[in-house]
């Protein structure tokens, strides 16, 4: 019974730290959502461009979206890790596992990244419908735009895969944080 109480208080500390990390780093929360938004909107929109514009326009949108998304995500997650190195080191001193450290520091961003993906999906759909139905309604030869579930699912699968690989890489970075180095500072 005592072990369950300890485990419960341990989990509540990790959950508290996760929430506190999100609350104290509101700008980083925005950038995580923004990176996911960019990935979602630009990848899905780029595949629609071959029907609405040209393949070259689609490729340009895809490259711009991916560069923007990866750069933003890389900078945001690096900032989160670097800003919490002492916290991570202290958690490791107190016996928390790498998984618990990752859950406390990075875990709160997962749901937010998925929310960003959903917002990006809705945005690209709304923007393309606006363009096709209102802006170019009088232009001859503009095809009707329909939401492409297949592209959305492919984009979502790619996003989840890439995001989880990045989180794994950063969890390995957390594992390499030297307690001794932090204590000397």
Predicted regions and their residues:
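Alpha-helical transmembrane segments of integral membrane proteins
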Residues: 31-42, 59-75, 112-120, 155, ...
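Hydrophobic alpha-helical transmembrane segments
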Residues: 5-16, 59-64, 94-112
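C-terminal membrane-exit region of the final transmembrane helix in multipass inner-membrane proteins
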Residues: 1-5, 14-19, 23, 76, ...
């Amino acid at each position: 019974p005592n072990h369950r109480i300890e485990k419960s208080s341990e989990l509540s500390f990790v959950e508290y730290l996760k929430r506190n990390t999100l609350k104290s780093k509101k700008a980083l929360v925005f950038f995580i959502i923004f990176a996911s938004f960019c990935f979602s909107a630009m990848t899905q929109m780029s595949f629609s461009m071959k029907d609405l514009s040209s393949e070259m326009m689609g490729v340009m949108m895809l490259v711009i979206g991916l560069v923007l998304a990866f750069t933003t995500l890389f900078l945001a997650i690096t900032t989160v890790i670097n800003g919490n190195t002492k916290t991570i080191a202290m958690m490791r001193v107190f016996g928390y596992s790498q998984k618990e450290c990752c859950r406390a520091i990075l875990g709160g961003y997962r749901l937010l990244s998925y929310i960003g993906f959903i917002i990006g999906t809705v945005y690209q759909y709304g923007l393309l419908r606006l363009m096709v139905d209102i802006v170019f309604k009088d232009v001859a030869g503009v095809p009707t735009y329909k939401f492409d579930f297949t592209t959305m699912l492919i984009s979502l699968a790619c996003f989840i895969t890439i995001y989880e690989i990045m989180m794994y890489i950063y969890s390995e970075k957390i594992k390499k944080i030297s307690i001794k180095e932090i204590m000397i500072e």
